[in-house]
Amino acid sequence: MTLNQVVQRIKTIALAHKQINDFREGDVISFLRSGDIVYPACLLQILPGRISKAERQTTVRFALYLCDKVDLSIDSKDNELEVKSDLLSIAEDMMAAFDYPTYKLDWDFADEASIEFLDEDLEDML
């Protein structure tokens, strides 16, 4: 698969999820500066990878950011936990979708992924 095909497939999977409203590919700063994000959103950031002649394999690494807003006008701690819970569910759903049998024909997706919850005070706050 080409890099374009990989990105397009991830975009298709992300936007097929009923909770994801927006998908972008790029860096975090550009994503946050775009100003027209429809949350919950997914950002795909391509990271350094590798090409192995011996294994005849190209490894593409990326960071997948799942983002949503916390409504500060209601009980923010409970709302924040609810948002994190929803985003974790989305991540689990996407990991399962990456492993779909048809996709296994042309890509081998890692069995594990690291997760990290980030809290940022940004302009995109309610």
Residue ranges and their predicted role:
Residues 1-26, 46-126:
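Charged, amphipathic alpha-helical segments and their flanking helix caps
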